[in-house]
Amino acid sequence: MVVVVDTVSATPIRPRHPEKAARPDSLSPKKPEWIRVRAPTSRGYADTRAIVKENGLVTVCEEAGCPNIGECWDKKHATFMIMGDTCTRACAFCNVKTGMPEALDQAEPEHVAEATFKLGLKHIVITSVDRDDLADGGAAHIAATIRAVRARCPSTTIEILTPDFLRKDGALETVVAAKPDVFNHNLETVPSRYLTVRPGARYFHSIRLLQRVKEIDPTMFTKSGIMVGLGEERHEVLQVMDDLRSADVDFLTIGQYLQPSLKHHAVMRFVTPEEFAGYESVAYSKGFLMVSSSPMTRSSHHAGDNFTKLQAARAALSR
């Protein structure tokens, strides 16, 4: 691994992705018109940013370079990324910083709960970096954060987006026992692309993780998502849908992959809005309760509204 170190600045800054420094640049095609988003400039955006910084929190909105940050933060919606800003994995698609993380902040669960209260969130999304350095992958910390939010904001519904807890026995059970309302774990891509896109993960382990959630608590909503435009074929996307339905997953998200930098995996193709609509139609026909499929779809985009629709869809089935 090549590590690039800043030796010029008075306060040297470690690059976000040292493991990618030696890679050749990967060029992507020009973004089509349907990908354009406005720069974040609203008062709501500024207020959200102030509350996040005041509580010393990290958001995946910023760290992953989410294109929807302006829209979401204007509405005071933010996805908190706990357990630090540094991930132990080095996925080819992800903009989150990689390296050896710092020790967990034991006060973080309370800070997340306080920010949730100040933002007046009715639905909160909590995600995290991968913490392969921890014996439980950070499961106890995630559970503590869920409990802290429940105590401070009892009417707020909680959605978590978790790592895969690969080789972390008992970690999943710890998180499910904390009773989040939605358990989300993203597959990210089709199985054939894992070696180049998500080399530190295992596709069928992730499927089994989602299946296990339903075995532990059949009432818990489960959710997963993939990006398209990474070189996958249509039939592979349809197979992912079948695999997720075999695990009884309720909610599927499909969005366009966007390249964070020239050192990341290239965009192989921009999928058209019509193709996304087609995927949504097929997914509903396969039995998903909720599907969000569009170029700008991201796991946490419109999460609160989508949770309400998810509840309504389940209620309709029981009538």
Curated annotation (Swiss-Prot):
It is found in: Cytoplasm. Keywords: 4Fe-4S, Cytoplasm, Iron, Iron-sulfur, Metal-binding, S-adenosyl-L-methionine, Transferase. Binds 2 [4Fe-4S] clusters per subunit. One cluster is coordinated with 3 cysteines and an exchangeable S-adenosyl-L-methionine. Its main location: cytoplasm. Its cofactor is [4Fe-4S] cluster. InterPro entries: Aldolase_TIM (IPR013785), Elp3/MiaA/NifB-like_rSAM (IPR006638), Lipoyl_synth (IPR003698), rSAM (IPR007197). GO terms for cellular component: cytoplasm. Residues 73-289 form the Radical SAM core domain. Its EC number is 2.8.1.8. It holds the Pfam family Radical_SAM. One of its GO terms (molecular function) is lipoate synthase activity. SUPFAM superfamilies: Radical SAM enzymes (SSF102114). It catalyses: [[Fe-S] cluster scaffold protein carrying a second [4Fe-4S](2+) cluster] + N(6)-octanoyl-L-lysyl-[protein] + 2 oxidized [2Fe-2S]-[ferredoxin] + 2 S-adenosyl-L-methionine + 4 H(+) = [[Fe-S] cluster scaffold protein] + N(6)-[(R)-dihydrolipoyl]-L-lysyl-[protein] + 4 Fe(3+) + 2 hydrogen sulfide + 2 5'-deoxyadenosine + 2 L-methionine + 2 reduced [2Fe-2S]-[ferredoxin]. Pathway: Protein modification; protein lipoylation via endogenous pathway; protein N(6)-(lipoyl)lysine from octanoyl-[acyl-carrier-protein]: step 2/2. PANTHER family: LIPOYL SYNTHASE (PTHR10949), LIPOYL SYNTHASE, MITOCHONDRIAL (PTHR10949:SF0). Belongs to the radical SAM superfamily. Lipoyl synthase family. NCBIfam families: lipA (TIGR00510), PRK05481.1 (NF004019), PRK12928.1 (NF009544). This is Lipoyl synthase. It comes from Rhodopseudomonas palustris (strain BisB18).
